[in-house]
Curated annotation (Swiss-Prot):
Name of this chain's protein: Induced myeloid leukemia cell differentiation protein Mcl-1 homolog
Cross-link (Glycyl lysine isopeptide (Lys-Gly) (interchain with G-Cter in ubiquitin)): K116, K174, K177
Gene name of this polypeptide: Mcl1
Chief location bin: membrane
PANTHER family given in the database record: BCL-2 RELATED, INDUCED MYELOID LEUKEMIA CELL DIFFERENTIATION PROTEIN MCL-1
Motif (BH2): 284-299
GO cellular component: Bcl-2 family protein complex; cytoplasm; cytosol; membrane; mitochondrial outer membrane; mitochondrion; nucleoplasm; nucleus
Pfam families documented for this protein: Bcl-2
Lineage, opening ranks: Eukaryota, Metazoa, Chordata, Craniata, Vertebrata
Organism: Rattus norvegicus (Rat)
Subcellular compartments: Membrane; Cytoplasm; Mitochondrion; Nucleus, Nucleoplasm
Signal peptide as annotated in the record: none
Amino acid sequence: MFGLRRNAVIGLNLYCGGASLGAGGGSPAGTRLAAEEAKARREGGGEAALLPGARVVARPPPVGAEDPDVTASAERRLLKSPGLLAVPPEEMAASAAAIMSPEEELDGCEPEVLSKRPAVLPLLERVSEAAKSSGADGSLPSTPPPPEEEDDELYRQSLEIISRYLREQATGSKDAKPLGEAGAAGRRALETLRRVGDGVQRNHETAFQGMLRKLDIKNEDDVKSFSRVMTHVFKDGVTNWGRIVTLISFGAFVAKHLKSINQESCIEPLAESITDVLVRTKRDWLVKQRGWDGFVEFFHVQDLEGGIRNVLLAFAGVAGVGAGLAYLIR
């Protein structure tokens, strides 16, 4: 065993240009041994000739240890050195970060900045978590609006916009009747929600279907679970228009499902549930963002860009990409 290990060190040292290691270090005996080993190499024995085979019996390595390749060249053994195979942690992290995340695979192209794409997959994960976090008695928490919200302008405007959008999505047709409480600002917000929300649904239909299966909404009692999901979504403290519009878009997706199973009476409670959570938990943020006016401004599309978008979507529609490509999360 010592002979094998010693010869490997000699070969590595010779390859690196260092002095050979004899039995006695720098002693004459060590010098003579190095000369004999060099002679054996020149005569064609290679690394195997350095082994005193008649005098030393190679013992098998311990269990789990790698059997040294005594016939390999010094260069080959050097390349197999464990130290050379070690990768710095920062390089490993960079390699892992380079792998495309599932979110990036949702969109075939991204004509606008990444900051406005609604993140759907994280919501799917939170739906899964929320579905497992029901109360010990199996009941779902309800979220009735505080009494003061019933007379709140932001609440009334939000409820009217969200309720109108969900009903339109369920029936498949626009309601031509003017908005009451929301007024002109609500009309602009509804138009923006139609454009952005429809695109989100088309672009992330598969993810929404998975979320709907997890919630298993079949009646009005099941609609209450949507409140728990939304509350859980905002649990991390992150609030932005992309996340809000994604939740409303998913609510519209649920409204279509309710229509398909003859549960249209649940659509209005669903709209109330969405409005309750948004206004109750995110009132300060909504006020700071100027409410629905801020929503319109955030997703505003310039006329020039709109013309370009129409051309791009004409081609994108052939590939089934959909109008949701442009609406990215902040």
